[in-house]
């Protein structure tokens, strides 16, 4: 059973130190100390971050960012806990948090098209791909992404 709370300062340092291998290395983050200097990512006060635990293990985090008509949903997993079955449960909890904070607003996310494991997880949680894949540049580099939406 996952538990969660608002992400603490200490957790922001821990999460941004997570390192991924292979194709997933695009998800390696800028260190939190650097984010604090620029007001980016975990240092942006408009972001709503939550940390998820399985017992004493920090396994995931989410970010909810309210926009005018919808809410951006970001998700991250501790590298050693990827593919362990937490994704759907955590996504359902994230949807519940979103409905509580931002009632009536749909959620959306953007996921790299090659990340089939994540796409399947989001589809099982009720997200659907909208439109054609889009090429964009993010803080993690260039990529081709699906835009996925879950109605409010």
Question: What is each residue range found by the language model?
Answer:
Residues 67, 85, 96-98, 109, ...:
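Amphipathic, positively biased hydrophobic alpha-helical segments used for protein targeting
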Residues 104-108, 112-119, 124-128, 132-152:
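C-terminal "cap" of GNAT-fold acetyltransferases
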Residues 6-13, 17-82, 91, 97, ...:
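Acetyl-CoA-dependent GNAT
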Residues 74-92, 113-120, 124:
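Conserved glycine-rich acetyl-CoA-binding loop
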């Amino acid at each position: 059973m996952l538990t969660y709370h608002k992400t603490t300062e200490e957790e922001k340092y821990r999460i941004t130190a997570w390192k991924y291998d292979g194709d997933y290395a695009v998800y390696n983050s800028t260190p939190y100390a650097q984010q604090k200097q620029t007001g980016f990512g975990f240092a942006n006060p408009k972001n709503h971050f939550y940390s998820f635990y399985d017992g004493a293990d920090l396994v995931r985090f989410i970010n909810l960012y309210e926009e005018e008509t919808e809410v951006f949903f970001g998700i991250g997993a501790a590298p050693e806990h990827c593919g362990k079955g937490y994704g759907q449960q955590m996504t359902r909890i994230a949807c519940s948090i979103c409905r509580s904070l931002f009632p009536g607003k749909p959620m959306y996310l953007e996921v790299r098209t090659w990340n089939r494991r994540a796409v399947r997880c989001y589809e099982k949680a009720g997200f659907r791909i909208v439109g054609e894949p889009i090429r964009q540049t993010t803080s993690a580099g260039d990529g081709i992404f699906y835009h996925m939406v879950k109605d409010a």
